[in-house]
Amino acid sequence: MLAAYAARQSADDPLSGLEVGERPDPVAPEGWTTVTVRTAALNHHDLWSLRGVGLPADKLPMILGCDAAGVDESGREVLVHAVIASPGWSGDETLDPRRSLLSEVHQGTLAEKVVVPTRNVVPKPAGLSWEQAACLPTAWLTAYRMLFTHAGVHPGDTVLVQGAAGGVATALVQLGSAAGLRVWVTSRDAAKGEAAVALGADAAFASGERLPDRVDAVMETVGAATWSHSVKSLRPGGRIVISGATSGDAPAKAELTTIFFKQLQVIGSTMGTRDELERLTRFVAARGIEPKIDRVLPLARAREGFAAMHAGQVDGKVVFTL
């Protein structure tokens, strides 16, 4: 079958290890199902795998990809949930210390077929296109859990999204706007801030700019570069939900005094559960949300999508079709 896979790894030249070609068809073990992939989406996780982060070298060659939508063995249209719990685990799979994502231990979704545990598929709502459905299982699920599981916000509350352009940030803007939140964004690039406003944000500010009001919650994926601003922007009792640190994880100042004096909460968040993915798909379909897609390419041209993401030339999701 056709697949995009990591054949080698290089921290300096990640694209050198990407191959697009034939791989053996997967065989589903007992309790797993085979999904024939219709669409799959690209994530920065795939580039990190090519750099050698999170993917052990002894697992190569590894088919990349966490996001996919397709048809399961019974003919149902489904989305694939990428978080694989360890055998015997019950409860929230994101808390399983032995969990993995597709393409870390088990072969990923950038292929004609992928095998996953039977519980790791959720129905695709009829109102979602194949391309839209493929956008949801990673970045959008991460955003959904941040906003609706951890942030503790309600319609009318103000949420600050640090960094307007990333995949999670874009999803936060679209989800927050649809949920009746007042969404503010920051960006170093005025054009990207304007693009976020066009997607539904209520206002955009320069990175680090003093805000007109304190906010109820901050959605943090940037890390060190925005940490102090995030802490200082919160009202007393507010929450920072952090799911990434793209600028580094060691801020110059931890702001501990402000955190305890203002009784702030700092909450870590990673991916989401299968049930959250199912709720997300229903929410997106019911509200008529259209995930922002930068480009749609056949999987045979996967290298073009990887190269665009590596160069920072994407604005929205890159989706591959099969």
Task: Kindly label every feature range from the protein language model.
Residues 210-218:
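A short acidic, Gly/Pro-enriched loop at the edge of an enzyme's catalytic core
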